[in-house]
């Protein structure tokens, strides 16, 4: 945690790498992440403040102190979230993804470690666009590794694919990952429990196995099963998902939708990183407009500039 213009901020320092090849790859990923962060704005996306390339690769964002969704869920076990709370969090995630997809951005690493809570632990924000890519009609993307347990099967199902080799996939990979996160929100259990990451990937890709959607309300079960369909083209988009979640929430009684009190951390609390590969940006709530589609910055700032007031 550092301070910039009298506000606490999160600073992500990216190691430049040890070899020329690694340095080129990491700088490219850094440039891509900063370009995307600076081009979109939404209340469920971490607020971008700035970045610099030299002397170190640094990304500065708002500071979220509510902790990761992963840490929050683990703290509740063996209890589960109330359905309206779980679906409310899912709605935050779906709206963030709707915004990214509207700007042609695929996240590719949607998982609880990359979802952070505001100080009151009532709102979820999406972070870490390190694996994100802009989608074009002609682009063929590399089979880079996200986190197998949450990744869409089409990202890794071609076993002959070598590192850096190209393959086709589209924004629907995020819809599959969203379904796995939604299942986890509803059950508060690790998806594919009892399997290693590679076993879970094999089961999903080659045996078409999914976590059980039994014992859920029919409407939620239908959302899950539609989102994790094997054929990406049969999965709904996030605009449709938002509407499905809103419809489900509208069917709940007023008593069911009363939000319970939640324990929350001090705004000055510094929480540890959750797992390798995540940005670990812990932040307070930004005052951003609630625009479902998101919007571009009115005056885009320069991407790479150092912060004389950061210390």
Q: Positions of the model-derived regions?
A:
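Conserved N-lobe beta3->alphaC-helix segment of eukaryotic protein kinase catalytic domains
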Residues: 14-39
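Glycine-rich ATP phosphate-binding loop
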Residues: 1-18
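A short, aromatic-enriched beta-strand patch in the conserved N-lobe beta-sheet
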Residues: 50-51
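A conserved loop-to-beta-strand element in the N-lobe of protein kinase catalytic cores
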Residues: 54-62, 70-71
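Activation segment signature within eukaryotic-like protein kinase domains
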Residues: 89-90
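Conserved catalytic-loop aspartate of Hanks-type protein kinases
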Residues: 174
